[in-house]
Amino acid sequence: VDARERGEGNGVEYVFARKSIAAGDVAGLRPGVLEGVITGISWPKSCRWGTTSEYCSRPVRWLVALLDERVIPVRFAGLTAGNLTRGHRFLAPGPHGVATAADLLGVVEAAHVVSSEQAREAVIREGVAQAEQRTGARAELPEKTLLEVVNLCEQPTVLVGTFDEEFLRVPEEIIVDAMLMHQRYFPLYDADGKLTNNFIVVSNGDPAHADTITGGNERVVRARLSDAKFFYEEDLKHPLETYVDRLDEVVFQETLGTMKEKADRIVALAKHLAADAQLSEADAADAERAAYLAKADLVTNAVVEFTSVQGVMGSYYAAACGESDQVARAIADHYRPRFPGDEPPASDLGRIVATADKLATVRGLFALGQGPPGPPAPFALPRRAPRIAAMLDAGPHVTLAPAIAAPLDTT
C-alpha cells in the first residue's frame, strides 16, 4: 500500500504500484521465453509430428539455442536444443557444430544454406534473368508462387526445362495453371507474349546433377500436361450445355441449394438487369444464354482438376460448340473483377452477367441473415459489394433494387 502512486495515461488517472524484481540469470529465463515464442507461432495449415502433441508447419527435427557459447535447453516437440545444426541435405548434411550464437549464420551458409529469404529470392531472380537471356523468352513470376519457391529452397539453382510442342494445343491457361499452381514451375513467353514450350524450375538439388534434375522435372510436367490434354479433349466431346444439369450434383450452400439453383437465379437476374439496361433484343438473349452456361464448366474434367481456370474453360467450350463470341467472352469474364484493381468485364453484356452472378450470392446470403456485421461472412461477401459497384460505375446504368427485392425462387 505504501508503494502506491498516481499517474495518468491517455487522459485517465490510474493508481499503480512499483515492484522491484531482483536480477536473474538470463540463460535461466530464456528457455521459457523461447518455448513461448515457438508455441505462439500459428499457421493456416499445421501438422503434428510423431507422438508429440505440438503443432507445427513442418516436422521439427532439431533445435539450436545459444546465448553466446552457452546452450539454452529449450524443449519443444520432444526435442531439447543443443549446439548442433544441419546443412543442405545433399551438399553438407552435417551435423555441424556451432561454437557461439554469433557463428550460427556462418555455419549454415558454409553448409550450403542461404539463410536469408531476400538473398534466396535475389539468387532466383538473377538465375531467371540469365535464363531469359539464354532463351530469348520472358518468365512469369507471380509473387505468391515465387514466395513459395523461395521458401522451398535452401540453395536455389535455376534450370530450364522443355515439354513437347503438342501440348501447346491445349488452352494456355491450363498449362500455366499446371505449372504454377501444381508444380511451382515458371512459364516462359516469347516476344509476342505467346506461351513457349520452355519453363523454369528452381532446384534445391546438387547443381552438379542439373541435367538429371531437369530431365526428372520434364517427365513430371509431361505427365501433368498429358492429364490436362486428356481432360480437355474429353470435355470437348460434349456440348457445354450438357453439363448444366450436372450442376445439381454440386452444393452451392446448404440452404440456398445447388449450383444449378444458383445458376437459375443468375439467369433470372441477368434477364432483369438486361431489361433495365435496355440492351438490344439480341444482346439480352446473349446475356441470358451466357448466364445459363456460366457455371457449366464447374463439373467438367479440366476445371475439377485445375480449379483456377473456371470460367475460362467454359469460354473455350462455348466457342467450340458454336456459341457466339460475345457469349463465350461473357462466360470467361463473369468472375471479374476477381480482386481489388482487377478490371471489370469489357462489355456491357459481360458486366450484366458478372453483376447477376455476384448479386445472386450477396442477396442469398443476406436473406439467410449471414451478411455483415457479424461473424466472418462466407463466400468473401464483404468484397462482392465493391465489385458490383465497380461494374455499375463502368456501365450500363441499371437499378438494382427491383432485382434485389424479387423472391429468391422466382427472382
Which positions does each model-derived feature cover?
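Amphipathic alpha-helical "coupling" segments that flank catalytic cores
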Residues: 1-411
